[in-house]
Amino acid sequence: MKIFHNLSELPDFKNTVITIGSFDGVHTGHQSILKRVKALAEAVKLPSVVITFHPHPRLVLEGNNAPVQLLTLTDEKTYLLEKQGMDYVVVAPFTKAFSEQSPDDYIEQFLVKYFKPKYIVIGYDHHFGAKRVGNIDYLKNNQTKFGFEVIEIEKQFIDDIAVSSTQVRKALEKGDVATAAKLSGHYYSFSGTVVKGQQIGRGIGFPTANIAVTDPHKLVPPHGIYAVFVWHKGTRHKGMMYRGDRP
């Protein structure tokens, strides 16, 4: 998989199978879209392209102090997208000017200009353009003009819960990591830097690693004790995590 963070570095795409979205958390709803993209791209022998954005649109539109809690930071998101077998991931810069494009300019000057899609696989609730007035019907109305086909992926349900990033966040904010994992299709994860503590645990026979999560917008589960897997230098270890001020 190839990852691009700058539109000027993109290859000269001719025909592609694309999908577009924030993909925060890369949950089972997102995965249903990505599976369709991958299967279709393989069937028609065209490259699969996932287009996502950085920073998160709300941080641009509402400011960096917006109460945004992300399930995945950009590197975490691209890692999960890679596991879905995509050929290309494009992390497009999201700016105020980009958000103010008309839906027509978004289609012609962004999607068609850079990706020349043959197929656009998209979720039922996708919106785009200034004030989010563009939607899936708007894309469908432009199929003939630009020669692409729009494929809509319907809302996904698990245990009568409509899968969404919002529902995953709600579960995590309550400490319900089991429901979050079921909706996500994977365990919730975060990464950070090990920082030196008072080494009290080591003194009583339970050495610990203090992890600093420095991005203020990364969602961290509430205070509590959690069973975890820890990846360190390519090896997975079982562990216990305490989240709180002092164990």
Where are the predicted features?
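Glycine-rich, highly charged phosphate/nucleotide-binding loops
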Residues: 68-77, 101-107
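Classical nucleotidyltransferase
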Residues: 100-207
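Residue-level signal for inorganic ion chemistry
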Residues: 27, 81, 120, 180, ...
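N-terminal catalytic cores of NTP/NDP-binding nucleotidyl/phosphoryl-transfer enzymes
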Residues: 9-73
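Short acidic-hydrophobic, aromatic-tinged amphipathic segments that line or gate anion-handling sites
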Residues: 2-8, 90
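A short acidic, helix-capping loop that chelates divalent metal ions and anchors anionic groups
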Residues: 57-62, 97, 162-163
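Phosphate/ribose-recognition catalytic cores of enzymes acting on nucleotide-derived substrates
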Residues: 197-247
